[in-house]
């Protein structure tokens, strides 16, 4: 998260750190706990990765302190059958992680509440993005979970804001947030994690998908951050989680 602040411990109890093994384990993406055995993430976070090289940590606040957390390996995952790999705009960028061991719910570990239906576009609602993604133009990731409050914009506003960005297609199954001041947004490492919106309690209404970055890889928060719209996939999530 660019321009964010430290979250409080347990503030987003469904937030997971999705980690990849390559020599050692390290944070690669976010995810949201759906149940004790399933998690919601982005297809681009798992595309081409062997399941036994993926794990999630629940109840985590600080990457350097795993006390009170639970770790579960991933035994398989389901990517969306129409995931648009290779396109700049990652269509249907959603996936379910199937956990090899159950996570016990309670305290700072809770399942996410999803939207009830696809009736609310959340435009104009100030929501909260969260993640352990980059906080600046370097590859350095924060130790403490970051958050930032940003308003949701309409699909039309998001499309207009992306004019001139090569390959940036915005569809109705996207949901975008944009900081009017251009100071805060998602970045690499936030992918797969939640867009948290107030709606009779907090609901996870988006999965972090992509952002605009410079040729040097610096995320540009003056452009919208683009999320997969969870409410467009409620049936798919129900069919593929356990």
Curated annotation (Swiss-Prot):
SMART domains: Tryp_SPc
UniProt family annotation: Belongs to the peptidase S1 family.
EC number, as in UniProt: 3.4.21.-
Annotated coiled-coil segments of the chain: none
PANTHER family, alphabetized: ACROSIN-RELATED, HYALIN
Protein name: Fibrinolytic enzyme, isozyme C
Signal peptide region: none
Keyword set includes Protease: yes
GO biological process, one term: proteolysis
Keyword Amino-acid biosynthesis: no
InterPro entries on file: Peptidase_S1_PA, Peptidase_S1_PA_chymotrypsin, Peptidase_S1A, Trypsin_dom, TRYPSIN_HIS, TRYPSIN_SER
Keyword annotations of the record: Disulfide bond, Fibrinolytic toxin, Hemostasis impairing toxin, Hydrolase, Protease, Serine protease, Toxin
Disulfide bonds: 29-45, 127-197, 158-176, 187-219
Native source organism of the sequence: Lumbricus rubellus
Gene Ontology molecular-function annotations: serine-type endopeptidase activity; toxin activity
Superkingdom as given in the UniProt entry: Eukaryota
Top enzyme category: hydrolase
Domain Peptidase S1: residue ranges: 1-242
């Amino acid at each position: 998260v660019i321009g964010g602040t430290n979250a409080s411990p347990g503030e987003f109890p469904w937030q997971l750190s999705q980690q990849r093994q390559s020599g050692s384990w390290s944070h690669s993406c976010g995810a949201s706990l759906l149940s004790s055995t399933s998690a919601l993430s982005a297809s681009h976070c798992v595309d081409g990765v062997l399941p036994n090289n993926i794990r999630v940590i629940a109840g985590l606040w600080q990457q350097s302190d795993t006390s009170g957390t639970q770790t579960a390996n991933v035994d398989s995952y389901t990517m969306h059958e129409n995931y648009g790999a290779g396109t700049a705009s990652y269509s249907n960028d959603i996936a379910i992680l199937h956990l090899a061991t159950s996570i016990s719910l309670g305290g700072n570990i809770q399942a996410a509440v999803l939207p009830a239906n696809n009736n609310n576009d959340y435009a104009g609602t100030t929501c909260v993005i969260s993640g352990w993604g980059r906080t600046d133009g370097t590859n350095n990731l924060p130790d403490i979970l970051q958050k930032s409050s940003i308003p949701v914009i309409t699909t039309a506003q998001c499309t207009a804001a992306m004019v001139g960005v090569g390959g940036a297609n915005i569809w109705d199954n996207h949901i975008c947030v944009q900081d009017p001041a251009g100071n805060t947004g998602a970045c690499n490492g936030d992918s797969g994690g939640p867009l948290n919106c107030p709606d009779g309690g907090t609901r996870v209404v988006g999965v972090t998908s992509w952002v605009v970055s410079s040729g040097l890889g610096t995320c540009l928060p003056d452009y919208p951050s683009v999320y997969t719209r969870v409410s467009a996939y409620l049936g798919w999530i129900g069919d593929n989680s356990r």
